[in-house]
Amino acid sequence: MTEKIKELFSNYGGRFSAVWGLVIFWLAVDFFVRLGLALYSASQVSFSLWTLVKMFVVGFFFDLSVALHGMIPLVLYLAIVPRKWFDRSWNRWLVRGFVWLGASLILFGAVSEYFFWEEFQSRFNFIAVDYLVYTTEVLKNIRESYPVFPLIGVIGLLAAVVTWLIDRYLLVWKTEVNWKKRVGAVLLFILFPVISFFGMSGNYKNISDNMYNDELAGNGLYELFSAFRNNELDYHRFYRTLPDAEAEAILRAQLEKSGG
């Protein structure tokens, strides 16, 4: 079975087998993150069939867009390595290192999303951007609140297992792909990220009247970079407010009391 899978990858993009392995892993992790967060907030999430279908389908396209964007550096590296070097020992270990690093970051992102959701019932947003800006204070609070180093150790070990599985079942080292085909593969690969960058909007995740389902239809990393780019936060969602009429009445009463 392993050889048949590798033969398939060898014939169809074997040089980029590390990319396909990481993309598959990333999509699987995002699926289970979405499912896990939905179950965590089961009392607030709508579990109607049509809403769930929309949530997972729309979420899949957000996940795919993020995964393909994230793989661009590895795709470029795999494309430029000459054929005579591709099967060398140093390149094998370098690619395995890329896979391990990618798997570690994917798992770290999943764990971070859980803790962020636990506190804010939301995917990453502008609050997460502030966390990145005020890194020193945030890291201190995180170290005091969570077992950071044990978590990092577990993530590293799990990433090593994932790397071993991808290496054993998917990675192909002997490929005969000339530079023209490599350039064509790169252009095809980045086509979807380019289309999604200009054609997708974070508003596409608004699939229902339920705020939780809308958040779950999105993708944490997509929302993080969207918040960083747009520099905005839904004030009415994250801060307690009064109806405009009630707030105006209170303000008028205070002005009259002070003689204003």
Regions found by a protein language model. Name each.
Residues 220-260:
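Membrane/wall-proximal cationic-aromatic binding patches
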Residues 2-234:
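Transmembrane and membrane-interface helices of multi-pass
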